[in-house]
Each structure stands twice: as C-alpha cells, then as structure tokens.
Amino acid sequence: LRLDDNPALHAMAQNVESAAFVFIIDERWFAPSVHGFDRMGPHRMRFMVQSVLALEQALLEQGHELVILTGDPATCILEAANMLGCSQVFGQKEHTQEETEAENRIESVISAHWIEGQTLLHPEDLPMSLNDLPEVFSRCRNKVEKGGLKIRPLVHVEQWPIPIQVNALLFTGWLQRCESVLCPPVVPGAMVFEGGALAGRKRLDAYLWDTRLLSRYKETRNGLLGYDYSSKFSPWLAWGCLSARQIHAEVSRYEHEIEA
C-alpha cells in the first residue's frame, strides 16, 4: 500500500498507456480461521483502513482514483476489469498459501502479471533456490552474506499512465463495514500504530534520524516494554506501506553519515 519503490506499479507504468487502481478487501478476512479465531482484529483492521485511505489520497494527488471492492479477489477483479475495460492486471507477487491461491484464481479469468516486491532480496538474486533455503535463519543469513548481498535499486514511477475514469462506479459499503473499528478502545499506555506510507516513513525517520535509536539497538533489542526498544517497522512492512529496500537504503545512508 505505497507508491514509492513499488515494482508492480513501476512495471505497470512502463507497459500500459492507461490504468485504474483497485484494492480488494478479501471476504475471507472477516471469516473465522480454521480454529475459530478472528482472522483480523480491530487494531489490524483499523491499520488497514488507514493505510487504504492514505493510498487513496496519494493516488488522488497523481490524478488517479482508487476502486475499493469487498469479496472474492478473482470475482472482484473480473467485474472491475469488465466495467473499466481493462484486459490485464499487475500486482505484487505473493508467496503464502491463500494469497497464491487467489493469484491462481485471478489468472484463470484475466491476464495477470505478478511482480516481486515484498522482500529485500529478489528470489532470482539469492545464492540458492527457494527450495534449498535453510530452515534456520542464521544459516540462511550466513549463506546470503557469503554470496554477497545483491539488493536491487529503488524504483519510482516517472511517467504515470492516463487515469481510467471511475466516477460512475459507486463501490461503497467497505468503509461503513470497518467504521466501527477506526477508533477501537485502547488501553492507556498501549502503542497505537497509524497506517499508511506517510506514517511509516515518519516512523523510519524517527527511529533513525530524529532519535538515532538505531545506534543503541543491540542494547535495547531484548526489551519488552515501550515504543523505542526496537524499530516497530513490522506493521508498515506487513501491509506494504514501507518496503524492505526503503529501510535498507536509509540504514545504509545512516551508516555512511552517522555511524556504522
């Protein structure tokens, strides 16, 4: 849920003349898990809604609108493509079970291009195949570091495609469904994370540049209380508001300008 360093967006902008942007709230997010638990609690849903609204605003600043749908991803994509006159879709490649199943269903109804953009290292740049990844993190890290870190440069859209007009499409109801969780009760003193790429960037700047907490990470990383004993980048990474490559680029700049 970001525009900066978005390889899927970058690939789309280089290959199409006009485009529409669609975000799908998967209906399975509201269904209980196989063990009967909620898949998405109020805090996570609140973060998601904020992130989508932030993306919508960022797209408006580029002259584009965001179509927001709720339902089965393949069904929603096909309906939106038919209504918008689109013949292909671009999106970020996923690697988890339900997401790859959704990708397969989408591919069965429309031409789809899935672009790697979720990880720091592109799978093609790893010194081993995905099937040969070590099961222990430290072994994986050592193997990758010995092979040399091959991190691809950040990408940015220079020429935006012409926006497809979607004013006549009234896709409503999703915000009303989530409205009650926009401001869930918060225990005093609990950490509250604000969704969106801008909020993620503010946290990145605060942790590195405003407080230089990165320099004390080894001393504080085992903490359990408070906001600043670790980076707390995870919520923004999980929803794609920040990319791992953006963080790596800023950490590298920090090491060069402040402290290695």
Model-found features: residue ranges?
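Trp/Phe/Arg-rich N-terminal binding region typifying the photolyase-homology
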Residues: 1-155
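Glycine/tryptophan-enriched, flexible segments
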Residues: 131-260
